[in-house]
Amino acid sequence: MEKKLEEVKQLLFRLENDIRETTDSLRNINKSIDQLDKFSYAMKIS
């Protein structure tokens, strides 16, 4: 039982890290999209 609990803790820890990395990646993607939108808008009005 103790071993199973430790395995579950490890899995949850890894999952938490994966979620954090995914969130950071999505945030970076959103920043890139915002920059592209600003660039596209600037090209339209120039």
Swiss-Prot record:
InterPro entries: DegQ (IPR012554). GO terms for biological process: positive regulation of single-species biofilm formation. It holds the Pfam family DegQ. Stimulates the phosphotransfer from phospho-DegS to DegU. Affects protease and levansucrose production. Belongs to the DegQ family. This is Degradation enzyme regulation protein DegQ. It comes from Bacillus amyloliquefaciens. The lineage of its organism: Bacteria, Bacillati, Bacillota, Bacilli, Bacillales.
